[in-house]
Regions:
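Catalytic cores of processing enzymes, dominated by hydrolases/peptidases
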Residues: 1-95, 99, 103
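Short, hydrophobic alpha-helical segments
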Residues: 102-112
């Protein structure tokens, strides 16, 4: 199957608050909504915000490029710094949860094709 969604993963500073922020971009559609619903469910009990503090709508974001110029769905995922240390076992639950959640998104997007 050809690509249907671009997922752009970023890091954000802890002071922004949530563990994860899902930015749906300037033209979110059904695939973005489905991905957000799945990620919010799969990432429990982490604090998952949507479009705040980062909505991925500025023209320079990968999500915006995908939606407005490539005809693809796009989603930006911001991960708080406290969950991004590759050598910190305390960060492992968030890394594992995000990996599992993205696998579920991938499977459901393939099924929706």
């Amino acid at each position: 199957h050809p690509a249907r969604m671009v997922v752009d993963i970023h890091g954000m500073a802890d002071h922004h608050g949530p563990d994860f922020c899902l930015g749906t971009g300037p033209q979110p559609g059904a695939l973005e909504e489905m991905a957000v619903d799945i990620l919010r469910t799969e990432l429990e009990p982490f604090d998952v915000a949507v479009d705040s503090p980062f909505d991925a709508s500025p023209h320079y974001t990968v999500t915006s490029l995908a939606q407005q110029h490539l005809g693809l769905a796009g989603l930006q995922i911001e991960v708080a710094a406290r969950w991004r240390s590759p050598h910190d076992d305390a960060a492992a639950p968030a890394v594992s949860a995000l990996s599992s959640a993205l696998t579920v998104v991938d499977e459901l997007l393939r099924d929706a094709a």
